[in-house]
């Protein structure tokens, strides 16, 4: 009798079986990345070094290629590309048509951690494809070239168990002439799509980004993906926090400030649990728009906004869409959310406002915000 379990499904079952054994990420992901027994530790001073180290980890001592990787891997990145970042910042509208730069982690399931050394910086993306158990921490990534070639800062495709933690991602929330919607600037900060699931995005500082990120590639990419966004700071961003198509998104203890178009856009029957966040100076921070149907639903709890009367206090405004849409302009829950399968201890929304900047982003020694710091 033929097996009814596909390779992808088998990978997800493996992820479930390891759920209680790996590191606690505060979200759906449970992984130690490459930081496990038998790991090989390397230092990379450039993008190409990272590429070479990963490729070398795909073959054994005899030079034979090993499916999924020959050994778990921890890479410390020490490079500094501030000169490229500064040049791009001085020529924002010239970046779109350049060649995209990035490290592709493809078909690697043995476990991989990339951690940026303090003071390092990158003008390249990290693209995770058909891989699992990937951790990226303390990377400062900005002003990437190659928007026309899908030059995302992070792209996660068909990859379960990925954790992006304590990174800084930045560009310019700016429109350049050249297309119908003036979209010739930069690509996304974090796109999660095409079968990617059990992903945790935590303690990142994301600023000056027009298109922050996707959860789902298209209206047909509505897999039952599970993603947690917690303790992130979003500042001066346009939209897609995320743009969610189907699946489940748990967003807690995030700081959203300076949203210029729309925030969490829950589409294609997606479900979102939005709790203990701080919203301010934001346009349509929770919405379901662009499709005209199949509206997503949300549960709102513990946020600094509790009722419509709070909108003026925190400078929250709402805009319509050309198609039928739903805004959270009554600030009420519109659905239910599945039981969260992991333990977490959110701090108050006020503590997020007061303290999160001391913890999110790079150079913070990967510290986390506990309730004891809120006093």
Curated annotation (Swiss-Prot):
GO terms for molecular function: metal ion binding; pectate lyase activity. Binds 1 Ca(2+) ion per subunit. InterPro entries: Pec_lyase (IPR002022), Pectin_lyas_fold (IPR012334), Pectin_lyase_fold/virulence (IPR011050), PEL (IPR045032). Pathway: Glycan metabolism; pectin degradation; 2-dehydro-3-deoxy-D-gluconate from pectin: step 2/5. One of its GO terms (biological process) is pectin catabolic process. One of its GO terms (cellular component) is extracellular region. The keyword Chaperone does not apply. It is found in: Secreted. Ca(2+) binds at residues 150, 152, 187, 191. Involved in maceration and soft-rotting of plant tissue. This is Pectate lyase B. It comes from Dickeya chrysanthemi.
């Amino acid at each position: 009798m033929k097996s009814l379990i596909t390779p992808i499904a088998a990978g997800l079952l493996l992820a479930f079986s390891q759920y209680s054994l790996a590191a606690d990420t505060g979200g759906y992901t449970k992984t130690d990345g490459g930081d496990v027994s038998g790991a090989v530790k390397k230092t990379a001073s450039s993008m190409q070094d990272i590429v070479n180290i990963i490729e070398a980890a795909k073959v054994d001592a005899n030079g034979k290629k090993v499916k999924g990787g020959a050994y778990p891997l921890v890479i410390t990145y020490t490079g500094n590309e501030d000169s490229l970042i500064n040049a791009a910042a001085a020529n924002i509208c010239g970046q779109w048509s350049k060649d995209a730069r990035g490290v592709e982690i493809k078909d690697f399931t043995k476990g991989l951690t990339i951690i940026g050394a303090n003071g390092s910086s990158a003008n390249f993306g990290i693209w995770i494809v058909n891989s699992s158990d990937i951790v990226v921490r303390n990377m400062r990534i900005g002003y990437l070239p190659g928007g026309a070639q899908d030059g995302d800062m992070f792209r996660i495709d068909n990859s379960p168990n990925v954790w992006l933690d304590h990174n800084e991602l930045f560009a310019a929330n700016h429109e350049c002439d050249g297309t119908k919607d003036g979209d010739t600037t930069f690509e996304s900060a974090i796109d999660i799509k095409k079968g990617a699931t059990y992903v945790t995005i935590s303690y990142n500082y994301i600023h000056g980004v027009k298109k922050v990120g996707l959860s789902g590639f298209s209206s047909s990419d509505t897999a039952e993906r599970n993603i947690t966004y917690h303790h992130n700071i979003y500042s001066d961003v346009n939209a897609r926090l995320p743009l969610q198509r189907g699946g489940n998104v748990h967003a807690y203890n995030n700081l959203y400030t300076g949203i210029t178009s729309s925030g969490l856009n829950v589409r294609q029957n997606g479900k979102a649990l939005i709790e203990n966040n701080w919203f301010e100076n934001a346009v349509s921070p929770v919405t379901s728009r662009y499709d005209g149907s199949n509206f997503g639903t949300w549960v709102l709890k513990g946020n600094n906004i509790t009722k419509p009367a709070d909108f003026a206090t925190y400078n929250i405004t709402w805009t319509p869409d050309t198609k039928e849409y739903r805004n959270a302009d009554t600030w009420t829950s519109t659905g239910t959310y599945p039981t969260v399968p992991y333990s977490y201890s959110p701090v108050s929304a006020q503590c997020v406002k007061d303290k999160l900047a001391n913890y999110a982003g790079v150079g913070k020694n990967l510290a986390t915000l506990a309730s004891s710091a809120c006093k």
